[in-house]
């Protein structure tokens, strides 16, 4: 079988291709009409038959985000996730985490090792990673041989921090923040009857048994 195309066959192929191109260029474009068998001249370009369609993707505009409509709408609908957790209550801890009067919390800075100085475009990411590891290790006790190792969880504490404690109590919580090239840790106390949320929040007592202050948060309010 001859694999080379003759000169007269080349001319026929070029002419056929031009005819196909002119056919589609001259045809009007109507909305979302796509390529189908009915729009192709039989015997002209059989290879085009069966090609996948190119669907028109409609993106929602900002004016439609968050609105509710009856029926089925066209286009993709965005998934809107609220930045705050609904139903958890409490007061959100401000960002960046600075100590503020009357809120009952302290801010400490996790200083970096001067011998470790990452460079390049990922410098901030590397410094934040180092600071996070040091902050976590700061509040995690070393494994004991007599007791099983438990996973670190924000809000974990001593026996008085158990939610089932009838006398009430406080639990210590921590939040990590990256502020102006430094890793800062904000510490505060919440009543044990309040939920442990992913977002850093101040909560008030709901059961009536939790004290206003405990031995953990007395230093948060400064000298009396």
Swiss-Prot record:
Zn(2+) 2 binds at residues 193, 205, 207, 210. It holds the Pfam family zf-Paramyx-P. GO terms for cellular component: host cell cytoplasm. The keyword Zinc applies. InterPro entries: Paramyx_V_Zn-bd (IPR024279). GO terms for biological process: symbiont-mediated suppression of host cytoplasmic pattern recognition receptor signaling pathway via inhibition of MDA-5 activity; symbiont-mediated suppression of host JAK-STAT cascade via inhibition of STAT1 activity; symbiont-mediated suppression of host JAK-STAT cascade via inhibition of STAT2 activity; symbiont-mediated suppression of host type I interferon-mediated signaling pathway. Residues 55-65 have a biased composition (Polar residues). GO terms for molecular function: metal ion binding. It is found in: Virion; Host cytoplasm. Transmembrane segments: none annotated. Zn(2+) 1 binds at residues 170, 189, 214, 217. Keywords: Host cytoplasm, Host-virus interaction, Inhibition of host innate immune response by virus, Inhibition of host interferon signaling pathway by virus, Inhibition of host MDA5 by virus, Inhibition of host RLR pathway by virus, Inhibition of host STAT1 by virus, Inhibition of host STAT2 by virus, Interferon antiviral system evasion, Metal-binding, Viral immunoevasion, Virion, Zinc. Residues 55-90, 145-172 are annotated as: Disordered. Belongs to the paramyxoviruses V protein family. Interacts with host IFIH1/MDA5 and DHX58/LGP2. Forms with host DDB1, CUL4A, STAT1, STAT2 and STAT3 the mumps virus V-dependent complex (VDC). Plays an essential role in the inhibition of host immune response. Prevents the establishment of cellular antiviral state by blocking interferon-alpha/beta (IFN-alpha/beta) production and signaling pathway. Interacts with host IFIH1/MDA5 and DHX58/LGP2 to inhibit the transduction pathway involved in the activation of IFN-beta promoter, thus protecting the virus against cell antiviral state. Blocks the type I and II interferon signaling pathways by interacting with host STAT1, STAT2 and STAT3, and mediating their ubiquitination and subsequent proteasomal degradation. This is Non-structural protein V. It comes from Mumps virus genotype B (strain Miyahara vaccine) (MuV). The gene is P/V/I.
């Amino acid at each position: 079988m001859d694999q080379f195309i003759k000169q007269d066959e080349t001319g026929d192929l070029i002419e056929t291709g031009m005819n196909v191109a002119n056919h589609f260029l001259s045809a009007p474009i109507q909305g979302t009409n796509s390529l189908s068998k009915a729009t192709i001249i039989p015997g002209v370009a059989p290879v085009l038959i069966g090609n996948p369609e190119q669907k028109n993707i409609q993106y929602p505009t900002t004016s439609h985000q968050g609105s509710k409509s009856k029926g089925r709408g066209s286009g993709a609908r965005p998934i809107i996730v609220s930045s705050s957790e609904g139903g958890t209550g409490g007061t959100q801890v401000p960002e960046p985490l600075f100590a503020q009067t009357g809120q009952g919390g302290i801010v400490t800075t996790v200083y970096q090792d001067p011998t470790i100085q990452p460079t390049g475009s990922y410098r901030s990411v590397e410094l934040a990673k180092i600071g996070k590891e040091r902050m976590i290790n700061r509040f995690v006790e070393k494994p004991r041989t007599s007791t099983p190792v438990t996973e670190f969880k924000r809000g974990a504490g001593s026996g008085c921090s158990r939610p089932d404690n009838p006398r009430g109590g406080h639990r210590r919580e921590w939040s990590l923040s990256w502020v102006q090239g430094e890793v800062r840790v904000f510490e505060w106390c919440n009543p044990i009857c309040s939920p442990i949320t992913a977002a850093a929040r101040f909560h008030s007592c709901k059961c009536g048994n939790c004290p206003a202050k405990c031995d953990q948060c007395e230093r948060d309010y400064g000298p009396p």
